[in-house]
């Protein structure tokens, strides 16, 4: 084993243990961050070209499967469902496999597949990988978007059953104003509801790719059904909208900007909300406007009450 590989395995092992420790202590935000960042590192190695990797194709496949399991555990921690799909004790079975990846030759304990090449960055990772976005955006529109793999369709959820005296909210995402709207490849919006600590209160939903782009607008015209009755949302909660697009040069999906709506803004009719610079600040502590130009996210709210 080369010194480079030994050091790499030690870093992976330390990251794995940190995530599992946070998980067992109930520090879910920290655990999710650690799991997602490690998953991206494993994913990168699993997808490395043969001559750029010290691992065999079979070992890279196993590394990719471990990345998938980290994603599954991260998703389970963010889920509002009581039944976790992928448990901590399941994840812990993978630590010795990762540690001994060079000699591991048994069947993988879980029926999963390596995550696909196109990826979404973990919180905090974008700052390390991206430089000034404006400098790059000039070339982002070069080439046809059709030459890249099609993104998975949106993950929109149906409206919840109505309950007497309870209010449901439908948010129509109409359009978003951006100075370089026409250059965005496969743009979509991730919608989540977070408490003041950035913890998910409902399942996260992705819109399908935008219906059309023109000048300074990306049009969606899609309805989001809030997956919780308005009265059941905790004090200080907010609905977040993260605008994401594919960056072919770097082969990942990046958050360009975000917006959010607080509980006192929930009222029927149209609303426009300001756009903020990434990374997404779910705790709303250090907000920076994306631009001084009059560009916003345009929404329309409909309340349903029995």
Curated annotation (Swiss-Prot):
InterPro entries: Aida_C, AIDA_N, AIDA_N_sf, C2_domain_sf. This is Axin interactor, dorsalization-associated protein. Residues 157-304 form the C2 Aida-type domain. Disulfide bonds: none annotated. Residues 154-221 are annotated as: Axin-binding. GO terms for molecular function: phosphatidylinositol binding; protein domain specific binding. Acts as a ventralizing factor during embryogenesis. Inhibits axin-mediated JNK activation by binding axin and disrupting axin homodimerization. This in turn antagonizes a Wnt/beta-catenin-independent dorsalization pathway activated by AXIN/JNK-signaling. Residues 27-62 form a coiled coil. Residues 128-138 have a biased composition (Acidic residues). The gene is AIDA. It comes from Homo sapiens. The keyword Cell division does not apply.
